[in-house]
A protein has these predicted regions:
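Active-site-flanking beta-strand signature of metal-NTP-handling nucleotidyl enzymes
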Residues: 2-10, 48-50
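Short, low-order "capping/linker" segments at domain edges
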Residues: 89-100
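Short, surface-exposed ligand-recognition loops at beta-strand->loop->(often short) alpha-helix junctions
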Residues: 8-21
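An amphipathic, aromatic/His-enriched active-site/gating alpha helix that lines ligand/cofactor pockets
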Residues: 28-37, 52-87
Length: 100
């Protein structure tokens, strides 16, 4: 079953482009099981990284693996709390449809 994860990041003022580029560069060689991802800049100046995974297993392998995206960008972001530089959401895709 396909999986989607969304990471919400609040870049420090003026650093959204740098954060975006670090994410893009860190994924340049691909990530096993990641079908596609989008980076959205919201009106509230947040970055949303929307990841589409081939399966829950692929997502869990990434989460439990040696990835370093957060470590790469945390110095450019405002913290949500003492421990977290982002908010993360994930779940299985229960409906998907292409628009006409």
């Amino acid at each position: 079953m396909k999986m989607t994860s969304v990471i919400a990041i609040t870049p420090k003022e003026g650093s959204a482009d740098d954060v975006k580029q670090l994410i893009v560069d860190s994924r340049a060689d691909g990530i096993e099981g990641l079908e596609k991802y989008s980076i959205v800049l919201t009106r509230e100046e947040q970055l949303l990284v929307i990841n589409e995974w081939v399966s829950l297993d692929a997502f869990m392998d990434y989460v439990n693996g040696p990835h370093n995206m957060i470590e790469l960008i945390e110095h450019l972001c405002n913290r949500y709390d003492e421990e977290n530089v982002c908010k993360a959401y994930s779940g299985t895709v229960i409906h998907e449809e292409l628009a006409n």
